Amino acid sequence: KKELVVGTNPSFAPFEFTDKKDGKVMGFDIDLINALAKKAGYEKVTIKSIAFDGLIPSLESGNIDVSITGMSITDARKQKVNFTDPYYESGLMAVVKKDNEAIKGLDDLKGKTIAVQLGTTGAKYAETIEGAKVKTFDSSDLACLELKNGGADAVISDLPVLQYFLKQGGSQYAKSVGTPKKGDFYGIATAKKNKDLCDKLNKALAELKKDGEYQKIYDKWFKAE
């Protein structure tokens, strides 16, 4: 039997998150990897939930075959794993409280308290902001809760994640500010030694984009109501 073991950190809606009703991991990434696996000839997909910073070590040790988790392709990560072609273009965005008029964009965050999710591109970016106090959380939801409770001036995270948060009710107390910083691409990670798998997934991804299946999955999660 051909089984694909997939590692993900399900705290990044709408890419991967745990369904409150039945505890199943769901999301755009999950639908995509299932479709890719099927195209590539796998009979079974097993999803393992792993802490974000444990994903690359799990690939290296062979505990999982691939990781799909809204992971940005960066040079530092490329030294440890192989990435597929990008499957999603993201970018960074900030959200603040609805009544905050002082922060108009990412440039106004100097010296402010910023909530971020551990290990993300947003967390890295926050560290570069002059005089900012960065508070780190295990999930993007918890970072947003800190904003709601008044413990942070802003949350920096990936554009689609924060858009989804606003759409799911966050807009009652929060708003996005400024222009998103684009040019961040998500890829599926495989172990360095597993080059064949990477090639297989790239081929499957190209096919999904060509036959309209990718667009269907995309629309399911990202099409505005």
Across the structure, where does each feature detected by a protein language model lie?
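Short loop->beta-strand "edge-of-pocket" segments that line small-molecule binding or catalytic clefts
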Residues: 4-8, 26, 106-119
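Acidic, polar ligand-binding/catalytic clefts
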Residues: 46-108, 174, 178-180
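Beta->alpha turn/N-cap motifs
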Residues: 8-12, 48-53, 62-74, 97, ...
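Extracytoplasmic small-molecule ligand-binding "clamshell" domains
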Residues: 2-70
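Extended ligand-binding regions for polar small-molecule ligands
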Residues: 30-39, 100, 118-120, 187-225
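Short helix-initiation/N-cap motifs at beta->coil->alpha
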Residues: 30, 45-57, 101, 118-121, ...
